[in-house]
Amino acid sequence: VRRGFLTLPAFLTLSSRADRTSPTSRAKTILEQFFCVPLVPPPNVDIPELGDAGGDEGPVENVRQALEKHRASPDCASCHDVLDPIGLSLENFDPIGAYRTAYPNGDPVDATGVYEGAAFEDISGLVPALVEGARSGACPSEQLFSYALRRRPSGDDRTRLKEIAERWGGGTIADLVKQVVTSDAFRLRAKGKAR
């Protein structure tokens, strides 16, 4: 049932709350860290906690239902239409990453969704699309470059990053590590000559 890094308990726990999962936080982390998509809260929008999403309509039974009510607001829908399918695909994993098929109240977990027009049953069905999307972009190169050099890329690094990404070509992580550590930016920095 576990499918790669996204289903490891450490990732799932860090992107959850202590008392419940947070599909929004999980999806935000995936988009920011694997796709380099910066997400910021919308301005001038009062964002209620999911526990408050039931309002006058009665109690919310599970996270999916809470997000559906939350997404009913036009101010929230534009981001949540993107975030929720990704985050809800991980609902089979509780706040500490243990696999589950039902919520504490007994409702069955529904981890289905649609991502970029393709339906999936759970994270296992979504991972191939996410991996393909991440590999086709420059984000993995940029993230590893930042980690290896212990700094965010500057304007001067854009050409280097483009070259690294092109040479990597969406190959394996080992291939990407090799491209970064053999780059002039990394090798010269290690000798104290690069920024």
Model-predicted segments: where are they?
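Active-site substrate-binding loop specific to GH73 endo-beta-N-acetylglucosaminidase modules
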Residues: V1-A148, R158-I173, K178-R195
